[in-house]
Curated annotation (Swiss-Prot):
<keyword id="KW-0843">Virulence</keyword>
<feature type="compositionally biased region" description="Polar residues">
    <location>
        <begin position="631"/>
        <end position="645"/>
    </location>
</feature>
<dbReference type="GO" id="GO:0009986">
    <property type="term" value="C:cell surface"/>
</dbReference>
<feature type="signal peptide">
    <location>
        <begin position="1"/>
        <end position="71"/>
    </location>
</feature>
<dbReference type="InterPro" id="IPR008640">
    <property type="entry name" value="Adhesin_Head_dom"/>
</dbReference>
<protein>
    <recommendedName>
        <fullName>Autotransporter adhesin BpaC</fullName>
    </recommendedName>
</protein>
<dbReference type="GO" id="GO:0007155">
    <property type="term" value="P:cell adhesion"/>
</dbReference>
<feature type="compositionally biased region" description="Polar residues">
    <location>
        <begin position="505"/>
        <end position="519"/>
    </location>
</feature>
<keyword id="KW-0732">Signal</keyword>
<dbReference type="Pfam" id="PF13018">
    <property type="entry name" value="ESPR"/>
</dbReference>
<keyword id="KW-0472">Membrane</keyword>
<dbReference type="InterPro" id="IPR024973">
    <property type="entry name" value="ESPR"/>
</dbReference>
<dbReference type="InterPro" id="IPR005594">
    <property type="entry name" value="YadA_C"/>
</dbReference>
<feature type="compositionally biased region" description="Low complexity">
    <location>
        <begin position="604"/>
        <end position="630"/>
    </location>
</feature>
<keyword id="KW-0653">Protein transport</keyword>
<keyword id="KW-0813">Transport</keyword>
<dbReference type="GO" id="GO:0015031">
    <property type="term" value="P:protein transport"/>
</dbReference>
Length: 1012
């Protein structure tokens, strides 16, 4: 019979075991069963029998088929050193527990508590003593362990971080890999922009992530220092592939190859988690400092070296696609960055070799020299390693020429003096009165301690001073004056050149007529002047009068505090200003002018480019002939102009003249306050207007034009789309060639036109020309005032008319056409239904093909026709052709009217119920009347019979006085009897009387006659 088992928890062994479905826990009713160690053997037998049953039924995953096909299969279990096995092929192994074939190296005879399941060489072992699970696959099918279900892989969760090279990794390790890789790649990109040397360091940092490679063995390890238990999938034939793994979701889940399917071969080659691959790339990049042209080849070699490491990594990691999206993205970024790096390398200036001792412009071995331009003036000092520019060399040449001439003169004078000495020593009339002083030359005077005066009329009065040259004077302590008429009066000052002057402490004046009067000032060049404290003037006729100012270049002038003027005729007069370029001017405080004729006159202004001008406060002009005159304005581009306050002009010939305006694009113009013009030839002239698109125009206040040739001229208008036009106030045109010319009009769709005030046209070629009209749908037309046309090709031409549906037409004033091809041409008419027609005034047609032609007529129903005036046709095919009639059918197609309420008023219709009730009442009345008639007839018949009976009584004969008689009669079955008497009173007077009886009625009568 069938046996059903369930899993229970064994407290003794701390494992799950199989038990009978009827087993219960200690304590009676419970949801679990606890097995004791004493009954473990029986329970394990049941477990293994259950497992064997599952294998036989093919429900234990991929092992079922293998077990059924195996030549020798069985199970073994041991507990406390004892084993229990049965023998037989396909059953229990008699010697299975001692077989050497059990997961070699994993289970030995010394193991005391373990359960084994085997089918040929394919085995599963639960090692209780070690707390491990072992898998082994046979040699026939390869070293593959597959986990799957009916629909795909199986999720392997609770996976500890892998340690050894053949360990599986979990999601957390892969996420760490992705993060560290992305970080390394980002570092690569940043380092490339900074320098090639920092790129090497950033790439090396990639190796410290979760995936590393041993430089000597090339082995790859994943999370080598990660703690946790071990799941070992190795077998007798070495490491094996783990297959059938579902896509990992949680942090500790294993990942499968499917999740890495999106990583292309080039991407895999681009990722080098191996330290040797990264080292190769790093070495190549370092070598690129000497010859960057080889970077591409070296990088390719380094990446190719890492390819084998990636293949191993792919095998170990078992891949992922969904959960390493960021890794794939990062690698794509690497490819892009490397491509950009190669492009950048072609123009990089690099060292000739790794020693970084030489740089050859143009590349090592290139014979053609390279021009180095725009070199700033280098610092001239004993310890300076700065490069000097042509201007400094020119000044040096001039000084050298002057000094050479002076030296020639002095040598000539010295020669003459020496010749004079040979004749007479008395020719030297110099005076050296200072301690250790020296005076050489006519009237030379050295009065300072350790001073030296060398030259005619030279004077060295300062301690440790030196005066060399005719009329040279060094009066400052530690001062030096070299050159004819040179003067060094400041402490530690130096004057070098004809008529040069260094009066400031620690000042230096070099060049003919050079003057350094400020403290710590430096003047270099003919007629150069440095009068400000810590100022520097470098160049012919250069002037640095501001404190901490610098003037470099012929006629350069830096008069502002902390100002810098660089270039011929450059001027920096503002505090903290900078002028860089020929004839550049920076007069505003904190201003910067860069470029020939550049001018920055506004406070905090910046002018960059030839003839650029920034005159507004905080303004910026960037580009040839650009102008930024408004406060906080910005002009970028050739001939760009930003004259409005807070305005921005970007692009060639762009103009932003309005306050807070923005012009972006060649020839763009933003003249309105708070206006924005974006796009070539765009214009935004209205206040708060916006023009976005080539040749777009927004001239109305608060208007917006978006699209090529779009135009918004109306106040608060909006035009969106190519060639769209919104000219009406508060109008909106949306769509190519759309037009909204009416005030408050809206046109939406290609070629849509809303020309009426408050009109709305929606749909391609839709037109709304009437005031407050609405046209919706392709080719819809609403020309009447307050008209509505909704539907393709619909038309509403009457005032207050409405047409809804394709090709619907409402021509009459106040008319309504609803339905495809519906026509309402009569005034106040309504046509509802496809093909319905309401042509009569105030007529209504409801239903497909219905027709109401009579004035005030109503046709309801498919094909219904109401042609009579005030007629009504109700129902499909009904015809009302007569005036003031209601028809519910047609000739031959009459129909009943059902569910009619009982009429109340005199003109109400009555229903059959009311009619039946009336007929019944009349019938009852008729019945009553008939009874009365019958009674009357009976009475009449009786009366006739009674009267007849009276007449039948004979009269009194002549000559007789009295006659008494009886009579009888019958009329229509009614019998009567009569008694009468006649008396002759006189000859001339006669009396007659009688009574008659018929049924229940009596008739009597009397009479008298007089005869003569």
């Amino acid at each position: 019979m069938n046996r059903i088992f369930k899993s229970i928890w064994c407290e003794q062994t701390r494992t799950w075991v199989a038990a009978s479905e009827h087993a219960v826990a200690r304590g009676g009713r419970a949801s679990s069963v606890v097995a004791s160690a004493g009954g473990l053997e029986k329970v394990l037998k049941l477990s293994i029998l259950g497992a064997a049953s599952l294998i036989a039924m093919g429900v234990v995953g991929p092992f079922a088929e293998e077990a059924m096909a195996a030549n020798n299969a069985g199970v073994c279990l041991t507990y406390n050193g004892s084993s229990n096995n049965t023998s037989g092929t396909g059953g229990w192994f008699a010697d299975g527990c001692k077989s050497a074939g059990w997961v070699q190296g994993m289970v030995t005879n010394s193991k005391t508590d373990w359960v084994g399941l085997t089918a040929d060489d394919t085995q599963i072992v639960l090692d209780g003593s070690a707390g491990s699970i072992y898998f082994r696959t046979g040699g026939i099918n390869g070293n593959v362990l597959t986990m799957s279900n009916a629909t795909g892989g199986v999720l392997l969760s609770g996976l500890a971080a892998g340690v050894n090279p053949t360990d599986a990794v979990n999601m957390s390790q892969l996420t760490s890999l992705s993060t560290s890789t992305a970080t390394g790649i980002t570092s690569l990109s940043t380092s490339t922009a900074t320098s090639i040397a920092s790129l090497s360091t950033s790439m090396l940092s990639l190796g410290v992530g979760v995936v590393t490679q041993d430089a000597s063995s090339g082995a790859i390890s994943v999370g080598a220092n990660s703690p946790g238990l071990t799941v070992d999938f190795a077998g007798g034939q070495g490491p094996r592939t783990l297959t059938g793994v579902a896509a990992g979701v949680n942090a500790t889940d294993a990942v499968n190859v499917g999740q890495l399917a999106s990583l292309s071969t080039s991407t895999a080659a681009g990722l080098s988690t191996a330290a040797s691959g990264v080292a190769s790339l790093s070495t190549s990049l370092l070598g690129a400092a000497g010859d960057l042209a080889s970077l591409s080849t070296s990088a390719s070699t380094g990446l190719a070296t890492a390819d084998s490491g990636i293949a191993s990594l792919s095998t170990s990691l078992l891949g992922t696609a969904d959960n390493v999206t960021s890794l794939s993205t990062s690698l794509s970024t690497v490819n892009a960055n490397l491509a950009g790096l190669q492009t950048s390398v072609d123009n990089v200036v690099s060292y000739d070799d790794p020693s970084k001792s030489a740089i050859t412009l143009g590349g090592a071995g290139v014979a053609t020299p390279v021009l180095l331009t725009n070199v700033a003036a280098g610092k001239i000092a004993a310890t300076s390693t700065d490069a000097v520019n042509g201007s400094q060399l020119y000044t040096l040449q001039q000084e050298f020429s002057q000094q050479y001439d002076l030296l020639t003169s002095q040598v000539s004078s010295l020669s003459t003096s020496v010749s004079g000495l040979q004749g007479s020593v008395s020719a030297n009339t110099g005076t050296a009165s200072g301690d250790n002083s020296t005076a050489s030359g006519d009237n030379a005077t050295a009065s300072g301690t350790n001073s030296t005066a060398n030259g005619t009329n030279s004077t060295a009065s300062g301690d440790n001073s030196t005066a060399s040259g005719t009329n040279a004077s060094a009066s400052g302590e530690n001062s030096t004056a070299t050159g004819t008429d040179s003067t060094a009066s400041g402490s530690n000052s130096t004057a070098n050149g004809t008529n040069s002057t260094a009066s400031g402490d620690n000042s230096t004046a070099s060049g003919t007529n050079a003057s350094a009067t400020g403290e710590n000032s430096t003047a270099t060049g003919t007629d150069s002047t440095a009068s400000g404290s810590n100022s520097t003037a470098n160049g012919t006729n250069s002037t640095a009068s501001g404190d901490s100012s610098t003037a470099s270049g012929t006629n350069a002038s830096a008069t502002g505090e902390n100002s810098t003027a660089t270039g011929t005729d450059s001027t920096a007069s503002g505090s903290n200003s900078t002028a860089n370029g020929t004839n550049s001017t920076a007069s505003g405080d904190n201003s910067t002018a860069s470029g020939t004729n550049a001018s920055a006159t506004g406070e905090n202004s910046t002018a960059t480019g030839t003839d650029s001008t920034a005159s507004g406060s905080n303004s910026t002009a960037n580009g040839t002939n650009s102008t930024a005159s408004g406060d906080n304005s910005t002009a970028s581009g050739t001939n760009a102009s930003a004259t409005g306050e807070n305005s921005t002009a970007t692009g060639t010939d762009s103009t932003a003249s309005g306050s807070n305006s923005t012009a972006n694009g060649a020839n763009s113009t933003a003249s309105g306050e708070n206006s924005t013009a974006t796009g070539t030839d765009s214009t935004a002239s209205g206040s708060n207007s916006t023009a976005n698109g080539t040749n777009s125009t927004a001239s109305g206040d608060n208007s917006t034009a978006s699209g090529t040739n779009a135009s918004a001229t109306g106040e608060n208008s909006t035009a969106t789309g190519t060639a769209s036009t919104a000219s009406g106030s508060n109008s909106t045109a949306n769509g190519a060639n759309s037009t909204a010319s009416g005030a408050g009009a809206t046109a939406t769709g290609e070629n849509a036109a809303a020309t009426g005030a408050g009109a709305t046209a929606t749909g391609n070629n839709a037109s709304a020309s009437g005031t407050s009209s609405t046209a919706g749908g392709a080719n819809a037309i609403a020309s009447g005032e307050n008209s509505t046309a909704n539907g393709a090709n619909s038309t509403a031409s009457g005032n207050g008319s409405s047409a809804f549906g394709e090709s619907a037409a409402a021509a009459g004033d106040g008319s309504t056409a609803l339905g495809a091809n519906a026509v309402a041409s009569g005034v106040g008419s309504v046509a509802t239904g496809a093909g319905s027609v309401a042509s009569g005034a105030n007529s209504s047609a409801y239903g497909t093909g219905s027709n109401a032609t009579g004035a005030g007529s109503v046709a309801i129903g498919q094909g219904a026709t109401a042609s009579g005036s005030n007629s009504v046709a109700l129902g499909t095919g009904s015809v009302a052709s007569e005036d003031n009639t209601v028809s519910v059918g047609s000739a031959g197609s009459e129909r009943r009217i059902t569910n009619v309420a009982a009429g109340v008023n005199a003109t109400d219709a009555v229903n059959v119920g009311q009619l039946n009730s009336a007929v019944s009442g009349i019938r009852n009345q008729m019945d009553g009347m008939q009874g009365q008639i019958d009674t009357l007839a009976r009475d009449a018949y009786s009366g006739i019979a009674a009267a007849t009976a009276l007449t039948m009584i004979p009269d009194v004969d002549p000559g007789k006085t009295l006659a008494v008689g009886i009579g009888t009669a019958n009329f229509k079955g009614y019998q009567a009897s009569a008694l009468g008497a006649t008396a002759r009173i006189t000859q001339n007077l006669k009396v007659k009387t009688g009574v008659s009886y018929s049924g229940s009625n009596y008739v009597w009568g009397a009479g008298m006659s007089y005869q003569w």
